[in-house]
Amino acid sequence: MVSRSAFLLFCVLFLATEETLASLFSSRLIHRFSDEGRASIKTPSSSDSLPNKQSLEYYRLLAESDFRRQRMNLGAKVQSLVPSEGSKTISSGNDFGWLHYTWIDIGTPSVSFLVALDTGSNLLWIPCNCVQCAPLTSTYYSSLATKDLNEYNPSSSSTSKVFLCSHKLCDSASDCESPKEQCPYTVNYLSGNTSSSGLLVEDILHLTYNTNNRLMNGSSSVKARVVIGCGKKQSGDYLDGVAPDGLMGLGPAEISVPSFLSKAGLMRNSFSLCFDEEDSGRIYFGDMGPSIQQSTPFLQLDNNKYSGYIVGVEACCIGNSCLKQTSFTTFIDSGQSFTYLPEEIYRKVALEIDRHINATSKNFEGVSWEYCYESSAEPKVPAIKLKFSHNNTFVIHKPLFVFQQSQGLVQFCLPISPSGQEGIGSIGQNYMRGYRMVFDRENMKLGWSPSKCQEDKIEPPQASPGSTSSPNPLPTDEQQSRGGHAVSPAIAGKTPSKTPSSSSSYSFSSIMRLFNSLLLLHWLASLM
């Protein structure tokens, strides 16, 4: 009887641990030109400053943003894919230049920031103790919030800690005179003299558990310790409103937010993105994707390291016909509106699509796409299929972008352009719509499955094998509070005595489930 009870107790504790390590955190994505974005990040006086969706002006704006992003990519020193300033030709004032944003809360007491999201970079940085930052007042931006943006001050947060040069994640340690100094950071871009620089700190990122797309109440929220760039000085396009309230890098490096959440035992090392018809969507931290998803491995390009989310396409197919010599390497870039292919492959794909279109070719003023048309009805064209290893296929069912009708005629284009880089392309958001894109960093692979985004039921993943405890990603003996007193780093299930709001990997629902299970176990034991 005793051994049976012990076995039952072990099973209960094991299941509780599994639940703990299989959590999901969700946040709403806000597309800067979506209806939601117009309502939530615009002042009433600027309601007419952005064009209507599906108008030619709307797609000119997105294409111009992509062009500037591509221009910066060619000169990037650090990141593989970087932000663009966005177009200033339509907005009557300064405008956000990124594609997707989300609200995050940092510190104690918490302060809100509307950060840009980027799968092509790694660091989370926010304006902080500003020496040279973009303006943070709402009146400066034609498409910003009715409230001002915030500036972070580490000394005002009781949970902030200095991040030292001695830490292995301090890439600028060679610039430090002493390992006890605070670690500096600089992110440089050659094009436009764009950069962000300052000092690294550690503080709390506030998260909320997600269950089947329902955000749970505040009692189930957790606080995760992450490394943050205290961005004192910005330059170039960052001063023009590219990301005035900061940027969250979602890249594969250890210093990215997903890496810290995983190492803290709060989630599996993976996240997913989905986009709805309004171009907004959701990001799910900890999502490994459904069992039915297809996948392909990420590629290592630079010094056998994963410098971004890069995959290899074996062939491009139009319908059931695969084109010869169309293999290439491509970035998966959620921060880009449209898709770019290497010149020689772009030409083959475009000509094959053009062969299936029975419509009049048309040049639209201000539209850079080469293959545009006008017709009495939208033509039916075969799907574009990107073929990966193991016969996995990414299907683009609607390869054309249709504009608003004009005088009874339908205007449409093939929204693909040459990438300008030999053998390298970039898949943008326009061809991700309708899919749940899973960035599985644990197994270093990209997953995808059909999705209606807001209707998806995202189930918590199974815990990873062997993840019964979480390694602490932060220093154990050199971490310091703002006042200079040594403070132990937070670990799963344990918090320092002087920082009661430190992260815990146990959700409220997990604890209640464990409590109820123990009551059941006690009742079963009494019957034996």
Curated annotation (Swiss-Prot):
GO terms for biological process: proteolysis. The active site is at D118, D333. It comes from the Eukaryota. Glycans are attached at N193, N217, N358, N391. It is found in: Cell membrane. It is an enzyme of class 3 (hydrolase). A lipid is attached at S503 (GPI-anchor amidated serine). One of its GO terms (molecular function) is aspartic-type endopeptidase activity. Its EC number is 3.4.23.-. GO terms for cellular component: plasma membrane; side of membrane. Keywords: Aspartyl protease, Cell membrane, Glycoprotein, GPI-anchor, Hydrolase, Lipoprotein, Membrane, Protease, Signal. It is a lipid-anchor; GPI-anchor. Pfam families: TAXi_C, TAXi_N. Residues 451-503 are annotated as: Disordered. Residues 494-503 have a biased composition (Low complexity). Residues 1-22 form the signal peptide. Residues 100-449 form the Peptidase A1 domain. Belongs to the peptidase A1 family. This is Aspartic proteinase-like protein 1.
